[in-house]
């Protein structure tokens, strides 16, 4: 049963004070960021500190602690801080993909307000000046943050154009389509494309691009189709190799776990999400990831 903001604030304080990490994880898993963000404000007004600071004092350090601190901080403030980290020094391309591409216009504009408040800079201006412009991944990010999408009502024509861009290896045309097409029309374009040409868009992207360019283009494609597809793909990147990327998985989870509930099903093409969490990460983080992504370590997911 969902609690009121007041009752949830009280319950959160009780759990943090008890230093019960398992209970805190379970509570976190039950509420979306729109509810948790209200509690963050209420908690500060009542107890004089933010829940993230209280969590830092109560729990042992480590990626699980960081994840829970992020979860009980305003979601778009977290995005703003992660963006700033990604742009500090050498660009963290993976972080930029996670932070920028898995984001719709409303969240992006709200993030921008936090970014300006915290860093006294304009997020878009900083991003545009800090990343290069010659590589497809950076061109995609620069176009994506405009959030200027419109319906063209030319699905068949766009599908044909998409094939032309993919066959010729023309990143500019592909990026324009990704950045200017609504989610609804992208789904239709993808359907017509697959039916007409007998091949998946993702297959041609993967065969024409590599490394960061491929990861960025596939993330954008999957996000427009279904956020759960994008989250699953990004999780698969973090979970690749003999050891998982804890920093990336914490970042992905904090930004996406309540916005991509289909992730655990979409991940089946890459493996078993719960099993990978348990295998790749320390026990604390593994348990937290399984709870937040709603996967059963004993089951198929």
Swiss-Prot record:
Stretches assigned to coiled coil: none
Keyword field: Annexin, Cytoplasm, Cytoskeleton, Microtubule, Repeat
MF GO annotations: calcium ion binding; calcium-dependent phospholipid binding; phosphatidylserine binding
Pfam families with a match to the protein in the record: ANXE1_4th
The keyword Transmembrane helix is assigned to this record: no
Cellular component aspect of the GO annotation: cytoplasm; microtubule; plasma membrane
GO process annotations (BP): cytoskeleton organization
Cellular compartments annotated: Cytoplasm, Cytoskeleton
Top-level taxonomic group: Eukaryota
InterPro entries in the record: Alpha_giardin (IPR008088), Annexin_repeat (IPR018502), Annexin_sf (IPR037104)
Annexin repeat windows: 2-72, 74-146, 153-223, 225-294
Its job: Giardins are involved in parasite attachment to the intestinal mucosa and in the cytoskeletal disassembly and reassembly that marks the transition from infectious trophozoite to transmissible cyst. They may interact with other cytoskeletal proteins such as microtubules in the microribbons or crossbridges, to maintain the integrity of the ventral disk.
Family (UniProt): Belongs to the annexin family. Giardin subunit alpha subfamily.
Protein name: Giardin subunit alpha-9
